Amino acid sequence: MSTRKYSKELVDGPNQAASRSMLRGVGFTTEDFSKPFVGIASTGAKVTPCNMHINELSEIVENSVNSSGGKGVLFNTITVSDGISMGTQGMKYSLISREVIADSIETVVGCLAYDGLITVGGCDKNMPGCLIGIARLNRPSIFIYGGSIKPSDENTDYVTVSEKVGEFSKGSINEDELIHYEKISVEGPGSCGGMYTANTMASAIEALGMSLPGSSSQDAISDSKNNDCVNAGIAIMNLLEKDIKPSDIMTREAFENAITVVIALGGSTNAVLHLLAMAHSIGVELCLDDFTKIGKKTPVLADLKPFGKHYMSELNANGGIQPLMKNLLERGLLHGKCMTVTGNTLEENLKDIEPYTNNEIIKSFEDPIKEDSHLRILYGNLAKDGAVAKITGKEGT
């Protein structure tokens, strides 16, 4: 199987001299034309902390692809920020941005005949947008998560500020105290640090098998995240050699794995919306009732914000989500034979994973946060086609 299934039509032969000439103008060499082209879709932008570092990560990916025998080609797509636009007219654009991301990635890769694709995302809608684009194209692909922000020195984050707005409205704190939290709570790059939408979807994608092990929990600014980018450049060449496509990875069983991990982590209700769209894009039948079926046998184990105590950076320091996935696999709650972007199956990836050193963040099956899913699918006259609610067991406390 040729690793240049698409690019050869763009650059091979005398008739494509003009195309090659244009590519030489952006730095291609004669040798590059015989290599597989790998598109690198960056969601980097300075509109939000979630994405302000992603262009730099994407350049690491590009260099890794180039040094691994491919030709990396970096391009950008958009991002917006729900956290900034929340409560304003700007939120009307939030879900639309998912489709713009998917459409733009599909457009560039399809037009310019890239043989493989690596996408790098940070803010909420980046993850499903990238995966929908990947699914439509169905070329060897990897998703890289931009990583989480660390909490402030006072152990606060963006959501803390939202809570302080409520306290100010109630009269519990004054405006100076509110401004203090505003100034100190978001310090540098990375996605919101709890199990909010971004970390939920990053974890779902790792469980799905479309990102490298560990990608979902790594800190945005860290050696491990830089290494994730280097390793992705190496891994994409393996996927091209073996012709492992998203359709080989994003199977019905893999989506069931993703749902299971989302529930165990106490993840966002938005996962329902996004996983359904991702499954549809790859031709996998998935419905609301699947979340109920899986939820009846899957406990919530993670004591993570917003309803818990801990941040993703703390879970990362304790091993990330891989030990959790191994626990779920050993309990028969995950499908171990699913292929992943490592070129190995899920159970092969998890074989040598060490257990957590304690149960402070990820609880044991004997002492769960909740014995079944926190995600509830509701039907009624207000939602004839279904609705999603989150029930943590702490309501009213």
Region annotations inferred by a language model:
Residues 100-107, 129, 257:
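Well-ordered alpha-helical segments embedded in enzymatic catalytic cores
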